[in-house]
């Protein structure tokens, strides 16, 4: 299980990304449409002044229950270990054991 502060840090990053998402997209769009080099540099500076954690690249997918970052399944938001246990217990609707 990941440390609780690691999970909280990730949640804080997610909030920051959502907060600055529109501003970041607007600046990137303006950079592509800017005609002069001076404008582009000015817009790049504004983009760099935004917090680092407002970039979506810094997010890491983590299990909602354990905080584990590896073996993460997007469809459920769970790590492979928790997914397996919950599927065996029948806690995930629509998930059935495979047989062929």
Curated annotation (Swiss-Prot):
Gene Ontology MF terms: rRNA binding; structural constituent of ribosome
Keyword Plastid: yes
Gene Ontology terms: cellular component: chloroplast; small ribosomal subunit
Subcellular location per the Swiss-Prot or TrEMBL entry: Plastid, Chloroplast
Main location: plastid
GO biological process: translation
Keywords, in A-Z order: Chloroplast, Plastid, Ribonucleoprotein, Ribosomal protein, RNA-binding, rRNA-binding
InterPro entries in the record: Ribosomal_uS14, Ribosomal_uS14_bac/plastid, Ribosomal_uS14_CS
Self-association and partners: Part of the 30S ribosomal subunit.
Similarity remark: Belongs to the universal ribosomal protein uS14 family.
Functional description taken from the UniProt entry: Binds 16S rRNA, required for the assembly of 30S particles.
Protein name: Small ribosomal subunit protein uS14c
Organism: Stigeoclonium helveticum
